[in-house]
Amino acid sequence: MKFLVTGGTGFIGKRVVAQLLQRNIDVIATDINTDKEKNDFEDYLSTKNVSSKNLELLELDISSKDDLKKIFRNYTITNIIACGYQMSNLIDSNPIKGAEVNIVGMTNLFQAVMDNKIHRMVFPSSQSVYGTTSEIFGNKPIHEDDYCGLQHQLFTYAVMKLLNEFMAQKYVSMHNVSIACTRPSVVFGYGRKRSSLMWAEEFATNPALG
């Protein structure tokens, strides 16, 4: 069993990698620029007391079909956890790059699941796909099967996540592959350095740090 974790040096990705290594699972962690985050990534793993003997850290641009083909040609990958994604602030500053990674890149991974007979792919979508929730739902709880449309969306990020979900459903129904997604809410914790949600990070960590 060997897991490919895209965005593996990122805020969520490195936590996923650590948990896999703790279970003695072989991991290929990739990111578009591993040099930039390598020190923080290695420091984080050291705090979790996990061995890196089952880990390979590689550079990968998921928007490049050639890069992906090379990975799957060189390694026997059984599962994919796709954490590599452009956040709202990066999408707004460079929409073309955002679309290349978030739409083309994710679709490349769905295709790779089919082409390489991957056991299962999992990716985080977002609770933001529900749109401006108070306007739509009022104070009632939101359920997983509640409607997610475009007319109440504020963020390109959420619309891209909706498209990812739609494409994943197409691959599942048309090609009988196993792709699952989650819809996490705001993800915060120590170590986040850049995000449009830094307010959540500061709200949680500043009181603890004094």
Task: Give residue ranges: language-model regions.
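N-terminal Rossmann NAD(P)H-binding glycine-rich loop of SDR-like oxidoreductase domains
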Residues: 3-23
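Conserved Rossmann-fold NAD(P)-dependent oxidoreductase catalytic core, especially the SDR/UDP-sugar
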Residues: 107-155
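NAD(P)H-binding glycine-rich loop region in Rossmannoid oxidoreductase-like domains
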Residues: 62-101
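Conserved glycine-rich Rossmann-like NAD(P)H-binding loop of the short-chain dehydrogenase/reductase
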Residues: 25-37
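SDR active-site strand-loop-helix element
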Residues: 6, 30, 80-86, 121-127, ...
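NAD(P)-dependent short-chain dehydrogenase/reductase
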Residues: 135-137, 166-210
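Rossmann-fold cofactor-recognition segment
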Residues: 48-64
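Active-site helix of classical SDR
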Residues: 156, 160
